[in-house]
A protein has these predicted regions:
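A nucleotide-sugar donor-handling region in carbohydrate enzymes
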Residues: 139-219, 242-247
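Donor-nucleotide binding loops and adjacent catalytic segments primarily
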Residues: 22, 191-277, 309
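A donor-sugar binding/catalytic signature common to diverse glycosyltransferases
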Residues: 99-103, 268-310
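Conserved nucleotide-sugar donor-binding subdomain of glycosyltransferases
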Residues: 67-107
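C-terminal alpha-helical cap of glycosyltransferases
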Residues: 359-383
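A short, glycine/small-residue-rich beta-strand->loop->alpha-helix junction that serves as a flexible
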Residues: 7-19, 218-222
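Conserved nucleotide-sugar phosphate-binding/catalytic loop shared by glycosyltransferases and other
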Residues: 9, 27-28, 32-80
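Conserved donor-nucleotide binding/catalytic region of nucleotide-linked donor-dependent transferases
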Residues: 322, 327, 331-353, 360, ...
Length: 383
């Protein structure tokens, strides 16, 4: 079977989960072509996966820890990228897949419909109009148009894949607003994680250990420094901080001995397995990876980013982490770190979700579901 897998490149969470899915599809004997762009495309290619270059659908703009929706819309229109969708259609025509899977990349969905191909939408958010609430009349109107758009998409696709734990443990549940008429087409696959817990060898790290994926660039830089100040308050807790490729880690000349800064980790799963706690933004895929490895999370969602804020709220309600904000003091942050490391209830809930992730096996579950749908469609055509 030939499978086209489109990837939304806004945030590497989409990329990491699509890599996991593509690897499983290849292992199951299918021919897979991934459509991606930017750094997302580069990362996919390092995994040895066949990739075609797509065009971005949206450009995100933010400042001081918040997402600026109006500026993002204006930047997207000015870029003119949406005028190049013909490139996507031509690529789909040349590859001629049997089935299309699109991770929040809607241009790929419309191209699949034009080619009369079965198409499945992978999504962890279906209430995008929240981004436009409380804004100007123009922005609220744009939000209503957006809702009508994706409601139509949800009705017409062949299936909707939610790469999360099934209800009631779904972390992205507050980001889902699905009509009753489409619920039968929704498939909760479980997390899409690149490696299985039992296959990963722990990194040699001093415990207790905190892994922070808060980058040190742009509006997250103040929080990055705040984590370092927190580490100074208790030298018995060890930290690995990911700064991102744009930060020169050599400039940090007076780090406490319990802090290590790294630009990038090629394989972060050994670090996850050796950590007692993760400090992260509110991105869905990072949460799925940490919880699939049984690690509680302190989440700092970007302000004004309703999807991340909802994820963090659900995380706290589920008892596997806490939602915090950028204004927190180092002393208060240390209190939360102690609580999540020392309170068995958080660890037990995270360990339960690790077991559930293993049982669900998201990449394999999606592959088997698509195979079954494809075979059923073939049988129906013959009859």
């Amino acid at each position: 079977m030939k499978i086209m897998l489109f990837v939304c490149g806004e945030g590497l969470g989409h990329t990491s989960r699509c890599i996991s899915l593509a690897q499983q599809m290849k292992a199951s004997g299918h021919e897979v072509l991934m459509g991606a762009y930017g750094y997302s495309k580069d990362l996919i290619e390092t995994k040895g996966l066949r990739t075609a270059e797509m065009v971005p659908e949206i450009q995100l703009v933010g400042d001081s820890g918040s997402l600026d929706i109006k500026s993002s819309v204006i930047a997207t229109i000015k870029s003119g990228q949406f005028l190049r969708i013909g490139k996507v259609h031509r690529m789909l025509k040349d590859f001629d897949p049997d089935i299309v899977v699109s991770d929040s990349y809607y241009t790929g969905i419309f191209s699949a419909w034009m080619r009369k191909k079965p198409v499945y939408l992978m999504v962890n958010q279906s209430n995008m109009e929240e981004f436009f609430m409380g804004k100007s009349f123009f922005m609220r109107s744009l939000g209503k148009i957006t809702k009508r758009f994706y409601t139509m998409v949800f009705r017409k696709v062949d299936g909707i894949i939610v790469p999360d734990f099934p209800m009631p443990d779904t972390i992205c549940k507050y980001n889902l607003d699905l009509e009753k008429r489409v619920l039968d087409s929704v498939f909760y696959s479980g997390p899409l994680v690149g490696k299985k817990y039992r296959e990963v060898r722990e990194a040699e790290l001093k415990r207790p250990h905190v892994l922070s994926t808060i980058g040190g660039f742009g509006y997250r830089e103040p929080l990055f420094h705040k984590v370092i100040e927190t580490a100074r308050l208790d030298r018995n807790i060890n930290y690995t901080l990911l700064s991102g490729p744009s930060i020169d880690s050599d400039k940090f000349t007076s780090l406490p001995e319990n802090v290590t800064i790294m630009k990038f980790i090629e394989d972060q799963f050994p670090y996850l397995k050796s950590s007692d706690l993760v400090i992260a933004p509110g991105g869905h895929s990072m949460m799925m990876e940490a919880l699939s490895f049984g690690v509680p999370i302190l989440s700092f969602p970007d302000m004004g980013h309703s999807e991340q804020e909802n994820n963090a709220t659900s995380l706290e309600e589920e008892g596997c982490g806490k939602r915090l904000d950028y204004s927190i003091s180092p002393k208060k942050l240390l209190d939360h770190i102690h609580q999540l490391i020392e309170n068995d209830a958080y660890k037990e809930k995270a360990q339960y979700l690790r077991s559930l992730s293993h049982a669900l096996n998201g990449p394999e579950a999606i592959t088997e579901m698509i195979e079954s749908k494809y075979l059923n469609q073939g049988s129906q055509k013959k009859s």
